Structure formats: structure tokens, C-alpha cells
């Protein structure tokens, strides 16, 4: 009986090891998983987000994030900011949803929802939902990025570190202690 159960279990495990995409989507115990745009659905990130008294469509085709080993999420997506004033459009290009506190470029950000943007002067800005600046930091230009996309999150150089990109402009992100 025990041998039969073990054989069935091994068959199920071998049959589920499937494609690299399936394996990439499944976090192993104790590991974080970087999420690509195709993995961020309206069940995780709403189609529309609230910011400065209006709602804007989230561009889930331009999204990225991290599912942490404990099941908590950090997600980011570009937004359609066409209904906002020029002053807000200059700063508000994307939206962050995070269930955990983050460190962005060394600055701590509590869990929550925020508007973000990359400014022409090389700064990255984080705003509360009322469009008030919380902080701004220097972003960096990654000329070595081979295939720049409008927004993505990639694994950083060390475990638990990530890079949030808008094209080739980026900031370092990690879960805060």
C-alpha cells in the first residue's frame, strides 16, 4: 500500500514538472517569485485604480511584481493618465500595490497603494493617493538593458532584491525589514 502511494505521488510530481513557464510561476517553499505581466491578472491588480479623485485604467500588459515566499505581493503597473492635469501626468505614470513594507532606493515605504513616476530630471517619485509627494530619489539609467519594455520588475543582483524598470530607467526595490 505504501509503495503504491509513493509511486502515485512520484507520477503526479513527474507529470506536473511540465514547462519552464509553469515552473517559473510556482514559487518553491522559501523562495520569492518575480511576476511577469501575463501573470498579473485583474484578480491580483484591479482594471481601474483610484488616484487624485479619479480612476484610471491600469495597463496590465505593462505590469510586473513579486510574490514573496510567504504569499504576500508587491505589484506595479502603468496607468492611463490621460484624464489628469499636465502637472499630475508628468509625475503619475504607474501604480504600486504592496502588501508589505518596501525599501525603494533605500527609502522605506509602508504597505499600501501609491502613484509613482520617473521624472525627466532623473528622479523617481512616490506619491500618496492624493498626489502628494512622499519622497523622490535618484533613478538610474541602465544602458545595458537589452530589451527594454514600458514597465517590468526583474530580480536584482542579490537574493531578495529587485529592480523596477520603466524602459531603461530603474530603481532598486526590496522588502523592508
Model-assigned labels for residue ranges:
Residues 1-4:
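Positively charged n-region of N-terminal signal peptides that target proteins for export
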Residues 7-16:
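Bacterial N-terminal signal peptides
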Residues 23-86, 135-177:
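Primarily secretory-pathway and cell-envelope proteins
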Residues 81-129:
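Mid-length scaffold segments of soluble, non-membrane domains
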Residues 130-134:
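Structural secondary-structure boundary motif
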